[in-house]
Amino acid sequence: MLMVISPAKTLDFETPPTTARFTRPQYLDHSQELITQLRELTPAQISELMHLSDKLAGLNAARFGSWDPAFTLDNAKQALLAFKGDVYTGLQAETLSDAQLDYAQDHLRMLSGLYGLLRPLDLMQPYRLEMGTRLANARGKDLYAFWGTRISEWLNEALADQGDDLLLNLASTEYFSAVKRSALKARIIDTEFKDLKNGHYKIISFYAKKARGMMSRFVIEERINSPEALKQFDVQGYRYNSEQSTPDKLVFLRNSAED
């Protein structure tokens, strides 16, 4: 089983990584192409394109300017440890053992507007480039056109390396839209996490994001390799619901949030 999750806007490059092991992103030639184009934008243009404050636009203009593909632990950090935010709060990667990180390296991928697809130990430098950004480029009108079917092809390669065809989608709609389902040689398992609110079960963004991270952790810890085993997910009050689920969409319900 291969999992995909979204990246995060919030980054942590201050806390020292919990491991010195790292790998190099596999698709940096594509990243360099985007960086070359992004360096041509002024902070004001970045602000308009990405809907950022002047301060954040200036920060990211500086990031694009200093981006250097010669990644080391001095100028970059492992992606799974650098991303923060709700999904990564649920995943708690900083407490994974070496053996669990090894398993994650083979079974988890992070979708990225700049890097395309990242493995957990791939080094990355700080950036802001959401997949939904309408950055016109030589390949089309936005980043979905830029990446085309490449991400799907790379996922196919990762699945082939495993001898498996099961892809667990724990990413947001914005990011999983960069995966062309028609190009995937895989069975996709989608997930939904709903909380009880005002008498109805609803997807509440903050909780759903955290739950995606918790399920990622569950798969890594238990080495889950089938949809049937995924149904045993029982963390912080979520329970599998057969009535709302289908064979390819697993729905988990929770009656009250637990800390």
From Swiss-Prot:
Positions in coiled-coil regions: none
Cited InterPro entries: YaaA
GO biological-process terms attached to the record: response to hydroperoxide
Gene Ontology CC entries for this record: cytosol
Annotated family: Belongs to the UPF0246 family.
Name of the protein described by the UniProt record: UPF0246 protein PSPTO_1244
Lineage summary: Bacteria, Pseudomonadati, Pseudomonadota, Gammaproteobacteria, Pseudomonadales
